Curated annotation (Swiss-Prot):
Localisation: Cytoplasm
Organism of derivation: Pseudomonas fluorescens (strain ATCC BAA-477 / NRRL B-23932 / Pf-5)
Protein name: Protein-glutamate methylesterase/protein-glutamine glutaminase 1
SMART domains: REC
Pfam families in UniProt: CheB_methylest, Response_reg
Record GO biological process: chemotaxis
Disulfides per UniProt: none
Amino acid sequence: MKIAIVNDMPMAVEALRRALAFDPSHEVVWVATNGAEAVKYCAELTPDLILMDLIMPVMDGVEATRRIMAESPCAIVIVTVDRQQNVHRVFEAMGHGALDVVDTPALGAGNAQEAAAPLLRKILNIGWLIGQRGSRVRSAPQPLRSGAPRQSLVAIGSSAGGPAALEVLLKGLPKDFAAAIVLVQHVDQVFAAGMAEWLSSASGLEVRLAREGEPPQSGKVLLAGTNHHIRLLKNGTLAYTAEPVNEIYRPSIDVFFESVASFWNGDAVGVLLTGMGRDGAQGLKLMRDQGYLTIAQDQNSSAVYGMPKAAAAIGAASEIRPLDKIAPRLLEIFAK
């Protein structure tokens, strides 16, 4: 994979170079010391992946991410020395299209390969996404066997650009919205709680992490909160699971949508928002095949038109709508 590094700290650049050297398939194609340089270099030679710092002179990583995704789009992972201190900047960058975030590997760590492992795992996952490898063949959902009372559910999946898209969508819904909402966003579990808090603050709705064994409930907004998949069980409750292991990116939107298609006992709408790759497209198709309404975000309003495009290509979306029209549509569907 051709990788670029954007960081103004020589020690951080060296730490990243050493970490990448553990995988000979990775090649550093250029290094920029600030965001403005990165925008320029990316236009001249667009890499497969950029490892982007947040705080830099001239232009920071948030603005650089915005510019690059608008002008020379490619996969971007935020690499920072203190994720928790920079949580709001991280979500800003993800709103502009960054895919993930990871700590800068420690230079001179006792076990250098172990220190590099989290970064290399992220890069492996990103490679799977940008490669857009074919999805596994999925069987049709099993007949509904849930004895849970009938309710309404909105199942939402998002990836690159998702935080900002979710903010817009949730802002358009009232606090007494008539359906349960479950969000599956590609975000590391370290950041899931922070993202729930950020979405709560930004949208005005109460957003919290989904708990093992709880059912979706009307008026509640639940966010998948671990690096395992989240799925609906036939008794109507939510569960985290490591299976299927062949779904590399976790949590998988496909896994959740498929479980809704199989086991949800009530009205439901599937919504697939901005994101890179194909995750969610097949699951959305299964929801549509089961008679549920499905919505994909349109190209013009998507930060990254990958997942919604894949859904549109296979006929998974009943409707394709601009982001700002999705919440009004949900209000129409679930009007009290």
